[in-house]
Regions:
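Alpha4 helix (beta4-alpha4-beta5 surface) of REC/receiver domains from two-component response regulators
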Residues: 8, 19-34
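C-terminal output helix
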Residues: 23, 40-49, 61
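A Lys-centered signature of the CheY-like receiver
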Residues: 36-38
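The C-terminal output helix
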Residues: 50-66
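Basic, amphipathic alpha-helical hairpins
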Residues: 88-100, 120, 124, 141-150, ...
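Basic/polar phosphate-binding segments, predominantly the helix-turn-helix DNA-binding elements
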Residues: 102-131, 157-180
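Terminal helix-turn-helix DNA-binding modules in bacterial transcription factors
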Residues: 122-161, 183-187
């Protein structure tokens, strides 16, 4: 299941009678997120599920709120990681194009718009439009960190047509204005 791009984002818990260390290792190597032996406590299972989901949500929040957390941190499987790598690469290739949108992204990913929406939403809990904008802003943060460009230049490099809209989006995403972000990096 973890190798199938349609199901790779779903956490897998193995409930099994096999209790050997080798069986546990095989289960985890095959992509299981947890391995629970029978007989098991229902309370333990519920706590394990809640913990897996809470940890996944923390990773997603870190990904969307921190400019330097990469997309692959929210991948639950190799298939998700490959998908996110290709997605990020495709966006970065077109990042300076203001008219780059979900339709173009879906076409370049060889997916329908609805399939792309479902997949991104299931992995990152954001829409494809939000994902494109997030990648634009993360790239802007990296460029700001480099110190090689002015804020006005960066806004156009990452595909924004307006520096004021760029600053507003940057602040909404990361909690600081680009100018404040630059100051915090230098200090």
């Amino acid at each position: 299941l973890k190798n199938n791009i349609n199901y790779s984002h779903i956490p897998i818990i193995l409930l099994t009678a096999r209790a050997t260390l080798q069986s546990k290792i095989e289960g985890i190597e095959l992509g299981a997120d947890a391995y629970i032996e029978k007989p098991f406590s229902t309370e333990y299972l519920l706590v394990k599920i809640a913990t897996l989901l809470t940890n996944l949500e923390k990773l997603r929040k870190a990904f969307t709120s921190s400019p330097f957390v990469e997309a692959r941190t929210i991948a639950l499987s190799n298939a998700d990681e490959k998908f996110l790598d290709k997605l990020t690469e495709t966006i970065k290739k077109n990042i300076s194009e203001p008219e780059f949108n979900v339709d173009i992204l879906a076409s370049e990913m060889n997916m329908s718009r609805s399939s792309l929406h479902r997949k991104i939403k299931s992995i990152a809990q954001i829409t494809p439009n939000e994902y494109i904008q997030l990648e634009r802003l993360k790239t802007a943060a990296q460029l700001l960190q480099s110190g090689n460009y002015k804020i006005n230049e960066i806004c156009y490099i990452v595909g924004f047509n307006s520096s004021s809209y760029f600053a507003k989006c940057f602040q909404k995403q990361f909690g600081v204005l680009p100018k404040e972000f630059c100051s915090s990096i230098r200090n």
